[in-house]
């Protein structure tokens, strides 16, 4: 959507969310909450290595994004306007250093080659970056020398990782991850909470917009004894609720996320948030605990794009919280789940709804809905 004026992007997103929510009787009255600057908002870039035929018929290593409509061709980039400006020189230096090795890019068609992906995370508060280079196995000394040079040339790079992947799939996540220099994590802040990020930690793409969403959630959530934070990730929603609720329970399937969530609670002096590892639909089957000892006043859900598991919906209805806050990155899944929640017992009604432009220049949008029990 980069060829569409930002005001028009927001109108299109409002229309899309409105149409989906109207199917369950919800009106989106407020405009979509914009970003002050719809450019350079992303805190993470995942680039792909490829090969381009250069002048003189010499194959040149490229690093960038897949060409529109092509699975195989990678467009070489010097700069991405969705990423903070300090990331661009790091990309250029990494491309130069990788080319200097003479090693080829990985080819998905033949499953041959070496360089696969380049991941860069940027800290808004520290103005530093974490760099992770994903390759196939081998060339240990070459990679260590490469990162030694990178850390000398780019002082903004505060953390360096080497990921090794033998997967046939074209995904950035490696089977092995080795810390090669700098700090083990990237430090940043979301509202008043200090956080630490690893290469594959999940954080909303725009830290600025995430802060607005969490502030809005706290404003809507009131106070109470117990809150649930389902699909809690790094624990940020739970931390934001910790001042208003006596006890917060966070659930997530990713143990790495929960390890950082516990670290974040300790770093920020929060002692009333408890994190549990597992699938929400499985952990919540302990009805004696969740529906009696830990029965919530508030349940917050932030599920993946596919939405809520039917068992989670059933448990939410069985727990009868006074309020349910649903944060969604897929308004169609949101509407589907709301239909199930509205048709169950006890009866819930939507009392607040707001859409946030988390992803300018794309069609994606975040939607926050507050349900209250009749």
Go through each PLM region and give its residues:
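Short, acidic/hydrophobic/Gly-rich beta-strand patch recurrent on exposed beta strands
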Residues: 62-67, 132-134, 261
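Solvent-exposed residues in well-ordered beta-strands and their adjoining turns
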Residues: 48-52, 68, 121, 134-136, ...
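Conserved loop-to-beta-strand segment in the C-terminal subdomain of adenylate-forming
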Residues: 126-130, 363-366
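A short catalytic or substrate-binding loop motif that flags glycine-/basic-rich loops and adjacent residues
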Residues: 37-42, 110-112, 180, 361-363
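Rossmann-like S-adenosyl-L-methionine
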Residues: 141-374
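Short, aliphatic-rich beta-strand segments
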Residues: 120, 127-136, 194-198, 298
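Extended interfacial segments that mediate partner engagement and assembly in macromolecular machines
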Residues: 1-107, 125, 140
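Short edge beta-strands and adjacent turn/loop segments
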Residues: 112-125
